[in-house]
């Protein structure tokens, strides 16, 4: 065996000290000195308690909204081209019908619509004197996918603003979303914050329409009946009907920022700031509709409908509605994060209490301790001094695992603890293979250093093959699994790499150093 380079021993010492340094905050917890790293392993939902939610995204509503947008696009195009038509309306979720007049320039209208709305199917029905626009199948597939992906991003932004540490938000299937909120203190508020669509629309009030006839069911075709919540004299809230034009003249997609503030009566309100486009539109709208009422509609409910007194420049508006301070704060959060592209429906809800979480932690730690003690005893009784070396390698393996998970700021779950227990046995198994190989070399009459060298070399390929196949499985679990399964895969992957390092490199360096320094002529395994 060649002389062992000193850098190998230095590397082992450096890795050991570094692992201890980064693992201590996770192992000790509590208030630590400022010079200690602030990265720790976070406990998962099953360990510290919290909220588990499974949502279904109503993607058909996103298609319906796309159809509504198609109405606006077609209307604007025909207005720009100065084309005449009797009416335009949405039929179903994905179709728009334009009713023609005898004077309509049908050919020109078809040409314009086909050029500008290329993703939609444009058809002319002569007997009915109609042009029909239908969303294409490819576009509908894209809308569904975008609705789910955007919902995940918006939920993440809302939760981050709410202040939940280490949330887990994952897509399940084509239209479902799993949300896990460890350690959440107010589940109802969190559910309200996540599930609120937060669609903000500005619409003009139809003050010329007959409200009484609308209440009897005779609503004008261009209007809809909505309700405004106001504070009642005896406390609480009452709903007041309003006849509002269907057309949205400004939407919440132009909101750049939203903050909670207070009005002159010290009541919480939400102040919104529009982007450049929204600011210009808002200024134009308020300038053209002075002395008219502008309804501020949030998720289908009128929050307020003030009279426009003057043109409002500067791109700012306020939303009032008898909010509590908490409600105003949450509304500002959802407006900043943006509206959900489609409503969310809770399919499954589970609340894990902190007591159950504490029991899970205790059981998990007990399993690790019992497994560790049994492994240590077996190795010492069967391999004596070599067993002690293997046990030290296992301790270092666990320390490296904890430090790497802390650096990754990973979330530890019960399956993750199961992965750690599994790794204890796998780490020792590698050492057992090596020690048996060294025994065989010693029986052939080789010197201790030569036996160690050949033993590690011959065991290397077997250990590498076993760990690579397991690592491939862990990668597949991480790629296609969710939540706890991914936690198990992460723990297993990181632990396997640490196990290979300690079994193949660390024990070899330490063993060779001991034999060389003590000038041992024989080895007893």
Swiss-Prot record:
- Report the membrane topology from the UniProt record: Multi-pass membrane protein
- Endpoints of the signal sequence: none
Report the record's Gene Ontology biological process terms. intracellular protein transmembrane transport; protein targeting; protein transport by the Sec complex
Q: Per UniProt, which keywords does this protein have? A: Cell inner membrane, Cell membrane, Membrane, Protein transport, Translocation, Transmembrane, Transmembrane helix, Transport
Subcellular location(s): the record lists: Cell inner membrane
Any one Gene Ontology MF annotation carried by this entry is: protein-transporting ATPase activity
TM ranges are: 9-29, 368-388, 392-412, 415-435, 460-480, 487-507
A GO CC term attached to the entry: plasma membrane
Q: Does the keyword Nucleotidyltransferase apply?
A: no
**Nucleus: is it a keyword of this entry?**
no
Q: Which Pfam families does the UniProt entry name for this protein?
A: SecD_1st, SecD_SecF_C, SecDF_P1_head
**What subunit structure does UniProt give?**
Forms a complex with SecF. Part of the essential Sec protein translocation apparatus which comprises SecA, SecYEG and auxiliary proteins SecDF-YajC and YidC.
Family membership = Belongs to the SecD/SecF family. SecD subfamily.
PANTHER family per the UniProt record, alphabetical: PROTEIN TRANSLOCASE SUBUNIT SECD, PROTEIN-EXPORT MEMBRANE PROTEIN SEC
Q: Which HAMAP family match?
A: SecD_B
Q: What does this protein do?
A: Part of the Sec protein translocase complex. Interacts with the SecYEG preprotein conducting channel. SecDF uses the proton motive force (PMF) to complete protein translocation after the ATP-dependent function of SecA.
What NCBIfam families does its record include? 2A0604s01, secD
Protein's UniProt name: Protein translocase subunit SecD
Q: Which organism is it from?
A: Magnetococcus marinus (strain ATCC BAA-1437 / JCM 17883 / MC-1)
Its gene name is secD
């Amino acid at each position: 065996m060649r002389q062992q380079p000193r850098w190998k021993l230095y590397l082992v010492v450096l890795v050991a000290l570094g692992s201890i340094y980064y693992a201590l905050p996770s192992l000790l917890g509590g208030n630590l000195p400022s010079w200690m790293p602030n990265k720790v392993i976070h406990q998962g939902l099953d360990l510290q308690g919290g909220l588990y939610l499974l949502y279904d995204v109503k993607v058909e509503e996103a298609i319906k909204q796309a159809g509504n947008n198609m109405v606006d696009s077609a209307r604007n195009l025909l207005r720009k081209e100065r084309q005449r038509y009797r009416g335009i309306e949405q039929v179903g979720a994905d179709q728009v019908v334009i009713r023609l007049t005898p004077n309509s320039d049908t050919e020109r209208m078809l040409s314009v619509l086909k050029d500008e709305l290329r993703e939609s199917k444009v058809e002319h029905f002569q007997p009915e004197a109609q042009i029909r626009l239908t969303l294409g199948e490819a576009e509908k597939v894209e809308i569904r996918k975008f609705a789910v992906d955007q919902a995940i991003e918006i939920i993440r932004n809302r939760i981050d603003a709410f202040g939940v540490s280490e949330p887990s938000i994952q897509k399940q299937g084509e239209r479902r979303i799993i949300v896990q909120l460890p350690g959440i203190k107010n589940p109802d508020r969190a559910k309200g914050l996540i599930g609120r669509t937060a669609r903000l629309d500005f619409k003009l009030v139809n003050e010329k329409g007959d409200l009484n006839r609308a209440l009897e069911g005779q609503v004008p075709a261009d209007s809809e009946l909505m309700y405004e919540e106001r504070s009642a004299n005896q406390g609480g809230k009452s709903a007041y009907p309003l006849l509002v034009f269907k057309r949205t003249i400004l939407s919440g997609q132009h909101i750049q920022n939203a903050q909670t503030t207070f009005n002159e009566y010290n009541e919480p309100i939400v102040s919104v700031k529009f982007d450049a486009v929204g600011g210009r539109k808002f200024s134009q709208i308020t300038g053209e509709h002075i002395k008219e009422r502008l309804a501020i509609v949030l998720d289908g409910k009128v929050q307020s409908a003030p009279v426009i007194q003057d043109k409002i420049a500067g791109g700012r508006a306020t939303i009032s509605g008898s909010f509590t301070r908490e409600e105003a704060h949450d509304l500002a959060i959802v407006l900043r994060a943006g509206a959900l592209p489609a409503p969310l429906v809770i399919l499954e809800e589970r609340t894990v209490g902190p007591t159950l979480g504490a029991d899970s932690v205790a059981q998990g730690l007990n399993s690790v301790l019992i497994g560790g003690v049994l492994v240590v005893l077996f190795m010492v009784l069967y391999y004596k001094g070599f067993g002690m070396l293997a046990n030290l390698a296992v301790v270092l393996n666990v320390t490296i695992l904890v430090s790497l998970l802390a650096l990754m700021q990973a979330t530890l779950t019960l399956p993750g603890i199961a992965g750690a227990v599994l790794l204890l046995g796998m780490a020792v198994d590698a050492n057992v293979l090596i020690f048996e190989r060294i025994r065989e070399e010693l029986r052939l009459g080789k010197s201790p250093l030569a036996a160690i060298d050949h033993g590690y070399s011959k065991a290397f390929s077997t250990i590498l093959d076993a760990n690579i196949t397991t690592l491939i499985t862990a990668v597949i679990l991480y790629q296609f699994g969710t939540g706890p399964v991914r936690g198990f895969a992460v723990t297993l992957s990181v632990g396997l790499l640490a196990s290979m390092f300690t079994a193949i490199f660390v024990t070899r360096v330490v063993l060779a150093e001991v034999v060389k320094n003590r000038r041992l002529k024989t080895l007893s395994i």
